[in-house]
């Protein structure tokens, strides 16, 4: 008769559960969540006991995974989420919560004592003799402090009020600017046309760009935006705007914040490689409002963009020349100024006068070269005097 396998006393203290305890922020928007369960998949970060690990897809678009990091017993004792380890009531880190409520007690430090402490509390929770932290013992001032910390928002510097042309309004730095909170377009490029940043010619040269912005010698500049860019098309099913001129450091969330002010966005497809994006609205009215407000151009975080109606299509099939043209298309919507010496800021208005005006300016700025030898110094010794 083969010898019987003895019961492992250490394994008897390991935790095995059928459902996690997580907060709503860690769960996806889809109510039907598919979770993967792994018995004794990892060790708890607090009590170091093996526990049942649950993992699920947090974002369907990016296939990002989330998982539980502490066991269910420690989560119940700390009243925290198993995934983000934040307090379930206030949404704060448990260290800040315990410091404010003065609930910090010296716990076991060694690994074996942590396991013993967790096993005893697990048995007490099952019998109903123990539970979460006793919040009722904390005074009302500490609880009010936690409420203020949970409701706190990041501080943003209020910008000055600007008009439609980007000029500061008189008196905006006084009471008027503080009363209205400033214009969110300043600095962030949200809600209106803001200042356009200059192009770094040295960085472009280091990246291997051709002189003159990389345009081919025989390529004609793109025309400025016209009524055909912002007038709604006859096809009522078109509810998308084509945005070009997106630079590499312009994040997607700033583009979304800019265009969601006109209506609810169904989807936003941004391709930094192609320097273009498609903004798909849920309603035709929102798309028409955004197109009429932009008038074929927009400035987001100092990045000039061209906005026009279009039908959604694939953005990853462009070649190198087409991608470069998409990048230049944004600045061509605002007109380009001639650079003399260093960098020059590009204004928000179109260049007037066309090619004839540019030729006149070039002709007036021409200087006649001096004859050869005029700059040589005439010494008396060379003349024989």
Swiss-Prot record:
It is found in: Nucleus. Residues 320-331 have a biased composition (Basic and acidic residues). Keywords: mRNA processing, mRNA splicing, Nucleus, RNA-binding, Spliceosome. Its main location: nucleus. Signal peptide: none annotated. GO terms for molecular function: pre-mRNA binding; U6 snRNA binding. One of its GO terms (cellular component) is U2-type catalytic step 1 spliceosome. GO terms for biological process: mRNA processing; RNA splicing. Residues 171-187 have a biased composition (Low complexity). Residues 239-312 form the RRM domain. Residues 157-233, 320-370 are annotated as: Disordered. Belongs to the SLT11 family. Associated with the spliceosome. Involved in pre-mRNA splicing. Facilitates the cooperative formation of U2/U6 helix II in association with stem II in the spliceosome. Binds to RNA. This is Pre-mRNA-splicing factor slt-11.
């Amino acid at each position: 008769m083969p010898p019987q396998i003895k019961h492992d006393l250490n394994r008897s203290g390991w935790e095995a559960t059928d459902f996690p305890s997580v907060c709503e922020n860690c769960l996806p928007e889809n109510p039907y969540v598919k979770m993967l369960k792994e018995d004794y998949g990892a060790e708890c970060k607090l009590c170091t006991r093996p526990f049942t690990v649950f993992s699920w897809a947090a974002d369907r678009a990016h296939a990002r995974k989330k998982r539980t990091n502490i066991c269910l017993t420690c989560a119940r004792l700390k009243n925290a989420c198993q995934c983000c380890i934040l307090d379930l009531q206030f949404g704060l880190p448990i260290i800040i919560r315990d410091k404010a409520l003065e609930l910090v007690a010296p716990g076991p430090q060694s690994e074996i004592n942590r396991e013993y402490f967790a096993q005893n509390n697990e048995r007490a929770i099952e019998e109903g003799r123990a539970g979460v932290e006793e919040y009722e013992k904390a005074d009302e001032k500490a609880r009010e402090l936690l409420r203020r910390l949970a409701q706190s928002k990041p501080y943003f510097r209020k910008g000055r009020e600007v008009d439609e042309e980007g000029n500061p309004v008189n008196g905006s730095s006084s009471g008027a600017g503080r009363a209205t909170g400033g214009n969110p377009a300043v600095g962030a490029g949200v809600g209106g046309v803001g200042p356009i940043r200059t192009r770094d010619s040295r960085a472009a040269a280091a990246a291997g760009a051709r002189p003159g912005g990389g345009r081919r010698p025989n390529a004609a500049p793109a025309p400025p935006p016209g009524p055909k860019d912002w007038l709604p098309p006859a096809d009522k099913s078109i509810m998308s705007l084509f945005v070009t001129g997106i630079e590499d450091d312009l994040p997607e969330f700033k583009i979304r914040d800019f265009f969601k002010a006109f209506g609810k966005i169904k989807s936003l497809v941004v391709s930094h490689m192609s320097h273009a994006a498609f903004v798909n609205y849920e309603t035709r009215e929102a798309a028409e409002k955004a197109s009429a407000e932009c008038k074929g151009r927009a400035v987001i975080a100092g990045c000039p963009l061209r906005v026009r109606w279009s039908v959604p299509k694939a953005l990853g099939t462009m070649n190198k020349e087409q991608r470069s043209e998409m990048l230049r298309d944004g600045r061509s919507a605002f007109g380009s100024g001639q650079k003399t010496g260093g960098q020059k800021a590009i204004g928000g208005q179109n260049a007037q006068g066309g090619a004839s005006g540019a030729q006149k300016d070039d002709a007036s700025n021409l200087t006649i070269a001096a004859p050869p030898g005029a700059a040589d110094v005439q010494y008396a010794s060379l003349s024989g005097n």
